[in-house]
Amino acid sequence: MEKKVSHVIDFLSNDEVQRQLGDPSISGISFSFDIRTLLKKHSGGNPQFFNYSMRDSFHEWCADIELGANTNELVTELLWDIIYLTEHQFLLPYYHGEHKKFQKKLVKRVGNHLNSLVNNSASKPTGSMTVNVRHVWRNVGDRYTLLYLPLYFKELIWCKANGSIFHVIIPHTKEHVIHEHKEWLLAILEMAGYWNLSHVRLYLPRDDLTNIQTLLKNLHWIGANLLPNENRNECNENDDITLSDETYIILECEC
């Protein structure tokens, strides 16, 4: 687990990324890829780096960062690490020690999803995903995105998109910017808009009480709805009981 996190951080610490983060007009970076990039013959385009910069008096995401000449050999392992770490956000704490078992299941899920994409069919969902669109977080993502907004968050932001929904696992905010939710929320909405997604779902840690209270007070401004968590009693035999959204408060808003 720690090795995967270190691998991702090392990748984000390349000279070009650090140079751009030193530019005062840039307040964030992003790395994004279509899951079909994992296929030898893929049509998902290449992974992309973006910066969130001020242009013409407003911020926007721009693909202005080069991956670098020596990244091709490492990129497949990196993409798998990002997928693993994103999906791991929904692994219940009780099962955090079962990394190998979780990884084995995840590889199978990703493989099934890629096969369905190759066959030009929709990914076949499992379990409760077939009956309740609210819990599509269980689906493997069509696209995975890593956000780094250092002005607002202590940690990396793990994201994935499936269908028209952008799932964003929000880390704890920095205390001195707790009320600046408008700025980081706009950055996330604009990233979702870049990929033509219609909705953003924010997964807020239940123990980040100040951030949750601030956002709940501003539901009207952000046009968000509070979504219920998955009912574990309604999970069927196909659902992976090691996964859950119960550690999060979930807000959904339109892009």
Swiss-Prot record:
Entry-linked InterPro entries: Acyl_CoA_acyltransferase, ODC_AZ
Pfam families tied to this protein: ODC_AZ
Entry-linked SUPFAM superfamilies: Acyl-CoA N-acyltransferases (Nat)
GO molecular function, one term: ornithine decarboxylase inhibitor activity
Annotated coiled-coil segments of the chain: none
Signal peptide boundaries: none
One BP term from GO: viral translational frameshifting
Similarity-based family: Belongs to the ODC antizyme family.
Quaternary assembly: Interacts with ODC and thereby sterically blocks ODC homodimerization.
Functional note: Ornithine decarboxylase (ODC) antizyme protein that negatively regulates ODC activity and intracellular polyamine biosynthesis in response to increased intracellular polyamine levels. Binds to ODC monomers, inhibiting the assembly of the functional ODC homodimer, and targets the monomers for ubiquitin-independent proteolytic destruction by the 26S proteasome.
Protein name (record): Ornithine decarboxylase antizyme
Name of the gene this protein is made from: OAZ1
